[in-house]
Amino acid sequence: MSDVSRYSDATPTLYVGCEPSVLSDRDGRIVAVGASARDSATGDFKVVELEGRALPGLGDAHIHLDELVLLRLGLDLHRTGSRHEVLEAVRAASRSAAPEAWIVGRGWNYSAWPQPQLPGRHDLDDAAGGRPVLLASKDEHSVWVSSSALRLAGITKETPDPVDGVIDREPEGAPSGILREAWQRLFAEMLPRPGRAEYQRLLASVISDLGRVGLSTVHTMDPGETLFALQSLREQDLLPLRVVVNLPADRLTAAQQLGIRTGWGDGHLRVWGIKAFMDGSLGSRTAEMLDGTGVARIPDPALHDLIERCLDAELNLCLHAIGDGAIHRALVALEPHRGSWPLWRPRIEHAQCVDPSDIPRFLRAGAIASMQPLHAISDREMADSVWGKTASNAYAWGRLAEAGVPLAFGSDAPVESPDPLKGLDAAVGWRSRVGWYPELALSEPRALGAYTLGVAYAAGMEKECGRLAPGYWCDLTVVSGDQVVATVVDGKLIFGRGLAPA
């Protein structure tokens, strides 16, 4: 394997041996594709011999760089399969932790345990020896905390539920140790975070690893600290991928005051919009459904106000909406504003359960369905159990595509793997293999489109990337079998496996 640490000063490069061949110029743009690529190569240029299939650079329209960074600092619980395994990981971490140190982890999923029952604070009290513990669930919508963590946050029997969240309680009313939605606000100030230099180092490592799985572009949903670190990497010419940033809704006022608009930045780092939560998640049983279940995190008056403010600021809006009730409310609110300004392209993030009657509203609202195919594999049994027959409307990529709804695919990493090849397989072949509503699957061309041109369109970049055509940025994901052999951005190799110049 070879990696390139700096990404400027592109050399005209001819990528051959793959299908199709591609020639890039000194500016990182495509000059020619296919049989004409070699004939068009003149003057000084480099030749790189590849094998396999050259795709437009694959993108991820929904990822969390900040959470991927923090995952490297705490307990990674994604592979734990039971309450016992989680507690053993906490117990092991506590052996080397100071008495007052926080133990933080991410990734537990009680729905996948042999006995799928929610845990409580007393388990953590024993495993951590009284230390404060905070363990975010796989979907990041619930948190499992110890008694000392509750005490430090000032959460008691008398503490009311947040307006957009739930504090689970024991029979006598004391907090059980499970909090759903809105937990970040309650604990954010006390959780340890890395210093600026350490954060940038970890962020650079995360981004490098994303290039290794074939990603050329990612859209991240992150706090302002991540944008600061990304700017620093960009200034040092250490940002190999294209990164599109969507800021949290509580940063909208600051963005307005600074005059940050959709498209602020350049081809490698730009701001697209604001991310806000309509509801919770399936895993935490907080997805807002048309039957009245779940949690509505933003009421209609606040939603309409948010839309107006985003329109005024010329910042796009990415609305997290998983349940069919949340999706319905979002689309109804967005519908009157279609075409309000040229780059107004609101997005419904996740869109996991769409009532068929709301599919035409996507078109009337000009909304993009930003979806993550791997969620379907993880959530299949849970969707059948919680949603019943309504699961026939879940992860309905094929139905949305047939109706003409723009699709942009991603992973929601670290909730799911960021590997786009796994996502492609989930979107195309998995449903037929397991017999789960196979009519909702996609053809390979449509799925590839959602990972390439769809990702570009969801950030207003469809005239510059997402296709292998002259004048477009030379972003390639080269695949042989089920393996990525090379990732190219701006005509420059950022990852290669066993490559040799011709």
Which positions does each model-derived feature cover?
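Non-cysteine beta-strand/loop elements that form the S-adenosyl-L-methionine
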Residues: 64, 268-286, 367-376
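Active-site microenvironment of metallo-dependent hydrolases
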Residues: 1-39, 87, 91-96, 200-212, ...
